Amino acid sequence: MDLTGRRAVVTGGASGLGAETVRALAAAGAEVTIATRHPQSAEPLVQEAAAAGAGRVHAEALDLSDVASVDSFARAWRGPLDILVANAGIMALPTRTLTPYGWEMQLATNYLGHFALATGLHAALRDAGSARIVVVSSGAHLGTPFDFEDPHFARRPYDPWAAYGNSKTADVLFTVGARRWAADGITANALNPGYILTRLQRHVDDETMRAFGVMDDQGNVKPLPYYKTPEQGAATSVLLAASPLLNGVTGRYFEDNQEARTVEDGDVQPGGVAAHALDPEAADRLWEYGADTLSAG
């Protein structure tokens, strides 16, 4: 891949999957902006890219749970944007946590913040002429159709994993709804990076980690045989961001570097993308919900 002259934004690019995505894009010659809550945390990666003679890498402040922060980032952007990788996320907050706007924190960070960022950068993406949005979702969406009636768990018991799945279904539906931008030369696709141990698990308690089989009785964490390294997990993100094989492809869901099969609720086979996450009517409804929520906030 030669991405010389291309400009990319990677949210949550200071560590884990995001850092590996940044490394790959910069190595191909792209100018990469790491959008992160703590820009100083990205400094080692910035210096690493400079020492390697890769594309320019720099960091800017962005808090996806704060609409003002997202708006500030988008307003400050100058020039076209070729690649937007919506990589940042949080998972399984143990207690119901709300933003100052009253939004459930996982939905706010994983979906609403990225929706606000993409819409705020729409003109920059359009001006690139052939831009790509890459959304990192999760297999957690499979059993969780988006709950339009109570997305913030105001009237039902809070469940950390249901909230996470809710946000990840929203991520996939966003890419389906983004087909409205195809005439602007913008494509959007989602992906499941697979099982990987990163800082994403920082809110998961030891009991759950043991139940998942990734922590022993002494508290030692180790991946299971089917777990990927962060570099392996980032491969599909990089494919969607840069491969000419994906020119013009939009509204699809990928895993392991290929388009995933569609599964219906109740399918017990691992992997795939749920039909409820590809529903165009739900995608349009979610787009309207996102726009209304942001305008009210």
Curated annotation (Swiss-Prot):
The active site is at residue 164. The keyword Ligase does not apply. Gene3D superfamilies: NAD(P)-binding Rossmann-like Domain. NAD(+) binds at residues 9-33. GO terms for molecular function: oxidoreductase activity. Substrate binds at residue 138. CDD domains: retinol-DH_like_SDR_c_like. Its EC number is 1.-.-.-. Keywords: Oxidoreductase. The keyword Oxidoreductase applies. Belongs to the short-chain dehydrogenases/reductases (SDR) family. This is Probable oxidoreductase. It comes from Streptomyces lividans.
